[in-house]
């Protein structure tokens, strides 16, 4: 499937996406067995074809041995009619059971996920945070708060792109 060239995400050319997919593939296979791997993919609405998350889901869904999981699918299934569970506790349970959390902070919900997950060392160690070009540097709460926590928890190999 060929992706549309027109995109609001101008700072992530398709070549860069392919390179990052290769990095994700390496993270999943380096030091692991060859069993099925599950990626929790967070970002802008997965149906928004202009989002970076949509592009990554398109590429990763074609990879053998990878299952993608989305926060909104969890919400639809588990929260229908339930008032006692918080979104954060349910999402944390799911994120805790996956091999890799790929988080693209490109929407209010994904900003909240980044903040929440960065506070949990076990989850932060599983995170690959992909900041869009214009947000990679500069003074911001995201860079000086959650991103620093992920770097701290990531040890020798923090996963911040």
Q: Which residue ranges define each predicted feature?
A:
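Conserved catalytic or regulatory cores that recognize and/or transform ribose-phosphate-containing ligands
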Residues: 1-161
């Amino acid at each position: 499937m060929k992706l549309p060239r027109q995109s609001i995400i101008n700072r992530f050319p398709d070549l860069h996406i392919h390179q990052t997919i290769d990095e994700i593939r390496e993270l999943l296979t380096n030091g692991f067995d060859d069993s099925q791997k599950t990626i929790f993919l967070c970002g802008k609405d997965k149906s928004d074809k202009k989002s970076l998350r949509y592009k990554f889901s398109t590429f990763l869904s074609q990879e053998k041995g990878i299952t993608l999981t989305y926060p909104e699918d969890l919400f639809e299934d588990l929260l229908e009619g339930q008032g006692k569970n918080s979104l954060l506790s349910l999402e944390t349970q799911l994120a805790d059971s996956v091999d890799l959390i790929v988080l693209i902070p490109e929407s209010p919900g994904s900003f909240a996920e980044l903040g929440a997950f960065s506070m949990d060392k076990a989850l932060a160690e599983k995170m690959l945070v992909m900041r869009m070009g214009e947000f990679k540097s500069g003074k911001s709460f995201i860079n000086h708060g959650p991103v620093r926590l992920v770097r701290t928890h990531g040890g020798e190999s923090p996963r911040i792109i």
